[in-house]
Amino acid sequence: MEEEIAALVIDNGSGMCKAGFGRDDAPRAVFPSIVGRPRHQGVMVGMGQKDSYVGDEAQSKRGILTLKYPIEHGIVTNWDDMEKIWHHTFYNELRVAPEEHPVLLTEAPLNPKANREKMTQIMFETFNTPAMYVAIQAVLSLYASGRTTGIVMDSGDGVTHTVPIYEGYALPHAILRLDLAGRDLTDYLMKILTERGYSFTTTAEREIVRDIKEKLCYVALDFEQEMATAASSSSLEKSYELPDGQVITIGNERFRCPEALFQPSFLGMESCGIHETTFNSIMKCDVDIRKDLYANTVLSGGTTMYPGIADRMQKEITALAPSTMKIKIIAPPERKYSVWIGGSILASLSTFQQMWISKQEYDESGPSIVHRKCF
């Protein structure tokens, strides 16, 4: 037995849950944040049907289940299902006893206070963890990039945030949230593929479209020009084989889909695009720190994985910012998991060890201790 017990790091996203051990360089378990319940009564006796399935098992049985996501727009909305996901994480994915390990959880920026308390309560009362901590996702992504100052544009499956951070502290007055993320882009791709004559409607088919999106979509540097290219030649067309063997062809949809990040009007939304939201977030900060934010704009989350997104961000923010400003967009290759990686780094710092909320402190102060110790 090593002299120190490894901390567990769990990053609960709207789309995927990333879990593993502090000090590891990547999460051991990555599975969909889904809980599925059977749609039909089981007819086979002795089949051992369960009343609920979590993660990949729910995904593989999706044809007979109703799938629910307990985390919407980055924030937990269904605590019973969330508890099932945590239970699955500890016992089935990581195969650990939660009462033996400190647990580092992540939360969305601007997470309601009651939610942090509820997370704390479940960890100590349901899972009996010896210690826990709740960290803000974007701050962890910044740590993972080796910085303590910068602005993080974190875009996952359910929500996008721009979070300016100065010397390790998020600046809450300048955090902006955009309810436009991966799931919306998947829905949009479903819609524009329907216009091509391919029909995708069920939750199971949505997963196929998500795969098409992840494999074939990219961000155009110049949207109008790319549209013209797509119209005049077939050079941008790619084919994709569906599970039943049918092959579909996809052309301008490849870049029209993620273009909605820069032009939310494509989705019928009135909000600003991710470039403008990032700029607005910077402008809400003190004039003296803006220079540091422009030069340290870090992309994080699965929805920033499109090829071409960093160049396009650079171009768009350069157009908005003062002309002399040095602008640098940092897009680490591991950014899909940078929140988790930042958590792993944090949990293994010697200086962090006194930051954990212990079971004893929780027993003395109750769930509100989380506001005093995690900021």
Swiss-Prot record:
The keyword Lyase does not apply. One of its GO terms (cellular component) is cytoplasm. The modification N-acetylglutamate is found at E2. Signal peptide: none annotated. PANTHER family: ACTIN. CDD domains: ASKHA_NBD_actin. The modification Tele-methylhistidine is found at H73. Actins are highly conserved proteins that are involved in various types of cell motility and are ubiquitously expressed in all eukaryotic cells. Polymerization of globular actin (G-actin) leads to a structural filament (F-actin) in the form of a two-stranded helix. Each actin can bind to 4 others. Coiled coil: none annotated. InterPro entries: Actin, Actin/actin-like_CS, Actin_CS, ATPase_NBD. Keywords: Acetylation, ATP-binding, Cytoplasm, Cytoskeleton, Hydrolase, Methylation, Nucleotide-binding, Oxidation. It catalyses: ATP + H2O = ADP + phosphate + H(+). The keyword Nucleotide-binding applies. In vertebrates 3 main groups of actin isoforms, alpha, beta and gamma have been identified. The alpha actins are found in muscle tissues and are a major constituent of the contractile apparatus. The beta and gamma actins coexist in most cell types as components of the cytoskeleton and as mediators of internal cell motility. It is found in: Cytoplasm, Cytoskeleton. SMART domains: ACTIN. This is Actin, cytoplasmic 2. Belongs to the actin family. Oxidation of Met-44 and Met-47 by MICALs (MICAL1, MICAL2 or MICAL3) to form methionine sulfoxide promotes actin filament depolymerization. MICAL1 and MICAL2 produce the (R)-S-oxide form. The (R)-S-oxide form is reverted by MSRB1 and MSRB2, which promote actin repolymerization. One of its GO terms (molecular function) is hydrolase activity.
